[in-house]
């Protein structure tokens, strides 16, 4: 029976080490080149409304900075989930105004 453990050492390697695609840092795009979508949703949240900002092409540090700024601007809590910023409550209009002021191409989507 074959071992389920991967080999501890590389036997053959051609063209040098291969970069892990998950470890690459995402490059921040300028706000003018980003198409950001803002929507309010309640699905899967026990009836609580959250505003989801998606389409951001920022690094992890950039997303954290934007999250902190949006939470402060809206006066509510929020989190990062799956490259989307979630802000508690229906804050679509406030977030749209803030992002447009920062230079993002933002649009409200959904109901």
Swiss-Prot record:
InterPro entries: DENR/SUI1_TIF, SUI1, SUI1_arc_bac, SUI1_dom_sf. Keywords: Protein biosynthesis, Translation regulation. One of its GO terms (biological process) is regulation of translation. Pfam families: SUI1. It comes from the Bacteria. One of its GO terms (molecular function) is translation initiation factor activity. CDD domains: YciH_like. Belongs to the SUI1 family. This is Uncharacterized protein sll0546. The lineage of its organism: Bacteria, Bacillati, Cyanobacteriota, Cyanophyceae, Synechococcales.
């Amino acid at each position: 029976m074959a071992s389920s453990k991967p080999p501890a050492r590389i036997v053959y390697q051609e063209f040098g080490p291969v970069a892990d695609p998950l470890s690459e840092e995402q490059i921040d795009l300028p706000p003018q080149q980003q198409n950001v979508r803002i929507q309010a949703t309640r699905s899967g949240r026990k009836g609580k409304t959250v505003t989801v900002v998606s389409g951001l092409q920022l690094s992890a540090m950039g997303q954290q900075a934007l999250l902190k700024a949006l939470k402060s601007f809206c006066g509510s809590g929020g989190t990062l989930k799956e490259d989307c910023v979630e802000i508690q409550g229906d804050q679509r209009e406030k977030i749209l105004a803030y992002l447009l002021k920062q230079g993002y191409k933002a649009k409200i989507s959904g109901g």
